Structure formats: structure tokens, C-alpha cells
């Protein structure tokens, strides 16, 4: 079974994390699939918006650390770097529909999304300090810009998680919804009706 599902519905591409047995821990192969899908969508005039979501209860438990230990993503052109480059430079509206745990990259990728819709019970976590890791995806720059230095420092230095209400208050997410994917689809459909730029 594919660990990244791709569905095109008219002008909307939905990319679904589909590794529920590992709470969608992201592997190098998954990163490369996501990077390739985003690159393709970026060059496809017919695609007007992209949604990233989950097929299960949790958005993602972050990077699959065992996979990363086998081949650390140190080089330019690695699957992780390809994904980060694609998500950072993506020129079309990128919407995330999330629920459950959004750990590590599950939170940091959201800084690169245009609209984020989260379930009320979503927990956001960037536990880099707990793992002895450096924050990824530009998060140590982007998170303080979003929430202010004091709030960002508290989260980064303690590794504490936060909920959807806090995420909404500080502007990390646009909306809390009991049905994040349905809400994200409505937003994507509205975007798709706008004139192309």
C-alpha cells in the first residue's frame, strides 16, 4: 500500500500521509514522493491548490528516526532537502488539514503552508531539545517571527507541546474544525474559483 496517496479532484491535488501503523512517521521515500508530487503540481497549470492531510487519526509522529539513522539527510539533493525546497518554494496555495499528533516536521512544515485547518484535539510538538536535535525546516527563524521570541523560546527550550487553541491564537492555524479535511476542501474549492495569477 502506498504511504503517500495522491488524488486529483479537478483543480485540487490532495496528498495523504498513509502510514498509520507508524503514526505516519515520514521516511526518505515518503519525502521524495511528496517532493516529486509538489514539483509536478507546481508545474501543472490545471492544479490550483494542494491539500496535505492524513488517512488516520494522527497527522504525523515526525521523522522516522530509524530510517534517518541509516542515511542521514546531510547532502543537498537528499529526499528531505528536496521536500523542504519544494515546500518552501511552492507557488500555489498549500493547505494542511491535520488532526491528532503533529510532531516535529508535522508542525514545522505548517510554517510553509498558506492555510492550516486543525481538529480541536490536535497536539503540536517540536521536541528537538528532548532528542538533542537542531530545529528543522527553518522553524527556529519562522516560529519566533510568527509567535514572538518569548513564546517560541519557551516551546523550543522546553520541548513542550501545545494545542489547537494556542495554535489559533498565535496564528499558526487559520481554523479549528471537527472535520479538517472537509473544511480544507471548501477552502481549496473557493481558491480554485479565483482567477489564476
Question: What feature does the model see in each segment?
Answer:
Residues 15, 52, 64, 109-111, ...:
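Hydrophobic/aromatic residues within transmembrane alpha-helices
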Residues 61-63, 143, 151-160:
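Short helix- or helix-capping micro-motifs
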Residues 56, 86-131:
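Glycine-rich beta-to-alpha active-site loop
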Residues 39, 46, 54-89, 102:
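Glycine- (often His-adjacent) and acidic-residue-rich active-site loop
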Residues 1-55, 85:
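Conserved CoA-thioester-binding segment of acyl-CoA-metabolizing enzymes
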Residues 104, 159-166:
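Acidic, divalent-metal-coordinating active-site segment for phosphoryl/phosphodiester hydrolysis
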Amino acid at each position: 500500500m502506498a504511504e503517500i496517496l495522491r488524488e486529483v479532484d479537478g483543480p485540487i491535488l490532495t496528498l495523504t500521509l498513509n502510514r498509520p501503523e507508524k503514526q505516519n512517521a515520514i521516511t526518505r521515500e515518503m519525502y521524495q514522493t511528496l517532493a516529486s508530487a509538489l514539483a509536478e503540481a507546481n508545474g501543472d497549470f490545471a492544479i490550483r491548490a494542494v491539500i496535505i492531510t492524513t488517512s488516520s487519526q494522527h497527522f504525523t509522529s515526525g521523522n522516522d528516526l530509524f530510517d534517518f539513522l541509516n542515511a542521514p539527510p546531510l547532502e543537498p539533493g537528499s529526499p528531505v532537502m528536496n521536500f523542504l525546497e519544494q515546500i518552501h518554494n511552492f507557488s500555489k496555495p498549500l493547505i494542511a488539514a491535520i488532526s491528532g499528533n503533529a510532531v516535529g516536521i508535522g508542525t514545522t512544515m505548517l510554517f510553509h503552508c498558506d492555510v492550516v485547518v486543525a481538529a480541536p484535539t490536535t497536539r503540536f510538538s517540536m521536541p528537538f531539545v528532548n532528542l538533542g536535535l537542531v530545529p528543522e525546516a527553518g522553524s527556529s527563524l519562522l516560529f519566533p517571527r510568527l509567535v514572538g521570541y518569548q513564546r517560541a523560546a519557551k516551546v523550543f527550550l522546553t520541548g513542550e507541546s501545545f494545542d489547537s487553541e494556542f495554535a489559533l491564537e498565535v496564528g499558526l492555524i487559520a481554523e479549528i474544525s471537527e472535520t479538517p479535511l472537509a473544511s480544507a476542501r471548501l477552502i481549496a474549492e473557493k481558491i480554485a474559483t479565483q482567477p489564476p495569477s
